[in-house]
């Protein structure tokens, strides 16, 4: 049986993912995402359409990391440099590198923004706040921009089945409401920093719209 979700481990993994010079270690980025998958799975099947895709993307990156060219995949920065210099990224249309590290991580990057926005809404929510609304608003600001209409429609329906705010606080395994809010307050700035570093790197290299 998998370990229960731990918000503390999210904090630790994303903190570990940042080097002194603000490069992002893929090993710890993946570890952070594995914790977030545990969070999604602890809420039942509502997020399965996202978590299954995330798991497959994590596996691709793990294969790169453990492969013969793994030394080029230590950080997101080294991966981008290596793949671009060796023409390993399909920049304008799907071609011979449909599962490049850059494309794979971009999908995780977009999903990370959604979770960051949702958890921030949860952190600042009140007793009468609806999780379905918070989650939908976060989705519409992020992932929805990259999904076709049918998926957006299905997602909207799925979010209607989200449990209440109390359940979300319970699955954090971080104590009472005050403790959960405090730990989210520590974790989310780290997630946001990792997101922004990646966003800036991808923007600089024109990688934000990879097919």
UniProtKB/Swiss-Prot annotation:
Cross-referenced Gene3D superfamilies: Glycolipid transfer protein
Q: Which Pfam families match?
A: GLTP
GO terms, molecular function: ceramide 1-phosphate binding; ceramide 1-phosphate transfer activity; phospholipid binding
What reaction does this enzyme carry out catalytically? N-(hexadecanoyl)-sphing-4-enine-1-phosphate(in) = N-(hexadecanoyl)-sphing-4-enine-1-phosphate(out); N-(9Z-octadecenoyl)-sphing-4-enine-1-phosphate(in) = N-(9Z-octadecenoyl)-sphing-4-enine-1-phosphate(out)
How does the protein associate with the membrane? Peripheral membrane protein
Compartment list: Cytoplasm, Cytosol; Golgi apparatus, trans-Golgi network membrane; Cell membrane; Endosome membrane
Biological processes annotated in GO: ceramide 1-phosphate transport; ceramide transport; intermembrane lipid transfer; negative regulation of autophagy; negative regulation of interleukin-1 beta production; negative regulation of NLRP3 inflammasome complex assembly
> What organism does this protein naturally occur in?
Danio rerio (Zebrafish)
Top-level taxon of the source organism: Eukaryota
The entry's cellular-component GO terms read: cytosol; endosome membrane; Golgi apparatus; nuclear outer membrane; plasma membrane
* Protein residues bound to an N-acylsphingoid base 1-phosphate: 53, 57, 103, 107, 147
Where is it predominantly found? cytoplasm
Q: Does the keyword Cytoplasm apply?
A: yes
Keywords attached to this Swiss-Prot or TrEMBL record, sorted alphabetically, are:
Cell membrane, Cytoplasm, Endosome, Golgi apparatus, Lipid transport, Lipid-binding, Membrane, Nucleus, Transport
Q: What is this protein called?
A: Ceramide-1-phosphate transfer protein
**Family statement drawn from the similarity comment of this UniProt entry:** Belongs to the GLTP family.
Q: What does this protein do?
A: Mediates the intracellular transfer of ceramide-1-phosphate (C1P) between organelle membranes and the cell membrane. Required for normal structure of the Golgi stacks. Can bind phosphoceramides with a variety of aliphatic chains, but has a preference for lipids with saturated C16:0 or monounsaturated C18:1 aliphatic chains, and is inefficient with phosphoceramides containing lignoceryl (C24:0). Plays a role in the regulation of the cellular levels of ceramide-1-phosphate, and thereby contributes to the regulation of phospholipase PLA2G4A activity and the release of arachidonic acid.
Q: Would the keyword Transport be found if you checked this record's keyword annotation?
A: yes
């Amino acid at each position: 049986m998998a370990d229960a979700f731990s918000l503390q481990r999210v904090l630790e993994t994303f903190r570990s993912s940042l080097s002194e010079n603000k490069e992002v270690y893929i090993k710890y980025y993946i570890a952070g995402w594995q914790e977030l998958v545990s969070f999604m799975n602890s809420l039942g099947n509502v997020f399965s359409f996202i978590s299954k895709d995330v798991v497959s993307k994590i596996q691709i990156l793990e294969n790169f990391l453990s492969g013969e060219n793994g030394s080029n995949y230590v950080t997101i920065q080294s991966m981008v440099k290596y793949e671009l210099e060796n023409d390993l990224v399909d920049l304008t249309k799907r071609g011979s590198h449909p599962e490049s590290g850059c494309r794979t991580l971009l999908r995780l990057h977009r999903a990370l923004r959604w979770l960051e926005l949702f958890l921030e809404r949860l952190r600042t929510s009140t007793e009468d706040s609806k999780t379905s609304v918070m989650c939908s608003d976060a989705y519409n600001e992020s992932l929805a921009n990259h999904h076709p209409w049918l998926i957006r429609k299905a997602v909207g329906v799925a979010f209607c089945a989200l449990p209440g705010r109390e359940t979300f606080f319970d699955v954090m395994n971080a104590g009472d409401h005050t403790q959960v809010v405090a730990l989210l307050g520590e974790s989310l700035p780290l997630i946001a920093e990792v997101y922004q570093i990646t966003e800036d790197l991808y923007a600089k290299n024109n990688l934000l719209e990879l097919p």
